[in-house]
């Protein structure tokens, strides 16, 4: 049975939660492999809507074991708050597994994230201010706090004291902030230890054994390809690797065990925060996409920037992730447009460029070259098969598939779990 990676093919917010939850009923494990509570996904089950930030979407599927891998950064307060909220709504969270090697977001990580962003002023990145970047920086600098450190108080104290020696200098001398007491941080972190302990496990061993036994394992990426720290629109990116390679390092599973890589692709394009966005709309079409699509960030609460579909971005995602399939979402949002522009290439310095430019300056100056496709007015939310879609909607999907470089195997035609057309099975 397969091990699948499911990830965002644009700038995040593509509808990964729905796709993951749809597959979650058929898989044995759903694994978050990077990011933290800077991700946000909304899952609709029946008449219930669940907004998750840290927990894998699969936690809503009774037969599935949700896993937080070693590549995730965990805010313990957010973790316990999400678990409590789900428990109150009758969701069984007892099967959750958390890697002991996952890093913890500390109070000083959050403080540094916020003061640094304010310090940058107009040059700010658009961080969520939740301590994600500073926690990953601590990890790379080898001064990070891991989940397993909660269960050795002396090691926790040593690590926090060592980290704060430098950070307090930074807070006081650069940001004019008061020093943070190491003892208070240790006390804050230890209060979560006993509640988290039942979930802590050797997740790398468990996942590899599960794959070897023929179980179905789904790796769920947060954010999106264009927010990847290596492959995204740097520096306007996240601090981890949402791309397919991150699933291997962030969960401890070798690349030869991955059998399928599915890219979630919105039928138009959105972005939250600063950074280049060639197809962004500043007119009534952009406002209509935002309103009809409900384009407001689950995590940030900020309105998303909206624009038309960008084919060079989709091809880029196919290339850097080795995508085998696309799951196209929010096709229903485009109902009602007489014509739908699709970006097929860019104009940069007077020249036509077919692919995403590797040079950030070129990408900042890229102007979209559009091809207009005919729209449709029929309601598509009740469509169950591809042939149920209006002819122009079918043609739109086929055009996107041809431009993007991988087959579109499923289509979202509404927010609900059942409002999906499956063309090719992912399993």
From Swiss-Prot:
Binds 1 Mg(2+) ion per subunit. It is an enzyme of class 6 (ligase). Substrate binds at residues 298-304. Pathway: Purine metabolism; AMP biosynthesis via de novo pathway; AMP from IMP: step 1/2. SUPFAM superfamilies: P-loop containing nucleoside triphosphate hydrolases. Mg(2+) binds at residues 13, 40. GO terms for molecular function: adenylosuccinate synthase activity; GTP binding; magnesium ion binding. The active site is at residues 13, 41. The keyword Ion transport does not apply. Its cofactor is Mg(2+). The keyword DNA-binding does not apply. It catalyses: IMP + L-aspartate + GTP = N(6)-(1,2-dicarboxyethyl)-AMP + GDP + phosphate + 2 H(+). GO terms for biological process: 'de novo' AMP biosynthetic process; IMP metabolic process. Its EC number is 6.3.4.4. It comes from the Bacteria. It is found in: Cytoplasm. GO terms for cellular component: cytoplasm. IMP binds at residues 13-16, 38-41, 128, 142, 223, 238, 302. Belongs to the adenylosuccinate synthetase family. This is Adenylosuccinate synthetase. It comes from Streptomyces griseus subsp. griseus (strain JCM 4626 / CBS 651.72 / NBRC 13350 / KCC S-0626 / ISP 5235). The gene is purA.
């Amino acid at each position: 049975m397969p091990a699948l990676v499911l990830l965002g093919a644009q700038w995040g917010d593509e509808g990964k939660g729905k796709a993951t939850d749809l597959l979650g009923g058929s898989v044995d494990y759903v694994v978050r492999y990077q990011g933290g509570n800077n991700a946000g996904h909304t899952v609709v089950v029946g008449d219930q809507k669940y907004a998750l930030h840290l927990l894998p979407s699969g936690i809503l599927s009774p037969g599935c074991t949700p896993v937080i891998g070693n590549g995730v950064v965990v805010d313990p307060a957010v973790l316990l708050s999400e678990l409590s909220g789900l428990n109150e709504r009758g969701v069984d969270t007892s099967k959750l597994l958390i890697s002991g090697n996952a890093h913890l977001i500390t109070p000083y990580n959050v403080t540094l994230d916020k003061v640094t962003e304010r310090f940058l002023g107009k040059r700010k990145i658009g961080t969520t201010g939740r301590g994600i970047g500073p926690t990953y920086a601590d990890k790379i600098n080898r001064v990070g706090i891991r989940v397993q450190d909660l269960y050795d108080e002396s090691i926790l104290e040593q690590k926090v004291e060592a980290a704060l020696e430098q950070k307090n200098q930074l807070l006081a001398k650069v940001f004019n902030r008061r020093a943070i007491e190491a003892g208070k941080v240790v006390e804050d972190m230890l209060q979560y230890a006993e509640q988290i302990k039942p979930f802590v496990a050797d997740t790398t061993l468990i996942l590899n054994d599960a794959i070897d036994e023929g179980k179905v394992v789904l790796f769920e990426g947060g954010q999106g390809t264009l927010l990847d720290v290596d492959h995204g629109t740097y520096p306007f990116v996240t601090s981890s690797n949402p791309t397919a390679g991150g699933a291997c390092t962030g969960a401890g599973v070798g690349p030869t065990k991955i059998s399928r890589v599915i890219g979630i692709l919105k039928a138009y394009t959105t972005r939250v925060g600063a950074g280049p966005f060639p197809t962004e709309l500043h007119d009534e079409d952009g406002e209509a996409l935002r309103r009809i699509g409900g384009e407001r960030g689950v995590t940030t609460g900020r309105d998303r920037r909206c624009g038309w579909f960008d084919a060079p971005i989709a091809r880029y995602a196919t290339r850097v992730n080795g995508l085998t399939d696309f799951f196209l979402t929010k096709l229903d949002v485009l109902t009602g447009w007489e014509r739908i522009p699709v970006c097929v290439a860019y104009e940069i310095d007077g020249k036509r460029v077919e692919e995403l430019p590797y040079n950030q300056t070129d990408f900042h100056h890229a102007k979209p070259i559009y091809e207009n496709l005919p729209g449709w007015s029929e309601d598509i939310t009740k469509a169950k098969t591809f042939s149920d879609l209006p002819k122009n909607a079918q043609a739109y999907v086929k055009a996107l598939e041809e431009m993007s470089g991988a087959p579109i195997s499923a289509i979202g035609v509404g927010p609900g779990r059942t409002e999906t057309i499956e063309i090719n099975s992912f399993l």
